[in-house]
Amino acid sequence: MKKKVLIVILILLISPLYAQDGIRWMSMNEALEAQTEAPKKILMDVYTSWCGPCKLLDKNTFGNKDVIKYVNKNYYPVKFNAEGTESVTYQDFTYTNPNYQEGRKGRNSQHLLAHALKITGYPTIVFFKENGDLIQPVVGYKTPEQIEIFLKMIANDDYLKLTTGEAWQEYQNNFKGSFK
């Protein structure tokens, strides 16, 4: 028992040191499994291989030390290729990409999970509750400063109080970001 406690303490002490190494991406299946052990919201980066803004989001935003630290602490981060072949079991259904064409250059067919989530542009960041239910997709490239409000609003459940456009506007006006 003491050995397990010591291991957990060491992991907690050492893990912030690795935050600078990058976001600890996982698959959607891994994130959903992790939620059963330790519930946490999921942040899904939906991208395609040909998407220029997706590459910028990866480099500039998900490479930012403040974003890395916050995402690793508050979310299970998922990387999901919207035109890939990964099989994902979500809410009792297994999603695939049956029309994927091996060796095709550029665009390919959309994965059925991306279709089910109504993803229409890339990149899209999709947020899920601790139980796996969809919260909200956020479409388009976001800088660290632009994504901060979404990361914190959703992690802190503030989005539950924002039921009108006016409430969202007031929230934005009062939000004081700290990401650089």
Predicted region positions:
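Non-globular targeting/processing and membrane-anchoring segments
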Residues: Q20-R24, T36, K118, K129, ...
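Detector for the c-type heme attachment site
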Residues: K55-K59, F128
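Thiol-based oxidoreductase modules, predominantly thioredoxin-like and allied folds used
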Residues: G22-W25, N64-K105
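Short active-site neighborhood of thiol/selenol oxidoreductases, capturing the structured segment around
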Residues: A38-K55, P77
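A short, hydrophobic beta-strand/beta-hairpin element that forms part of a small beta-sheet core
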Residues: P77, L113, G121-V138
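Sec-dependent N-terminal signal peptides
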Residues: K4-S15
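Structural micro-motif
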Residues: K41, T96-G103, H111-V126
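A short beta-strand-turn-helix
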Residues: I23-I42, V71
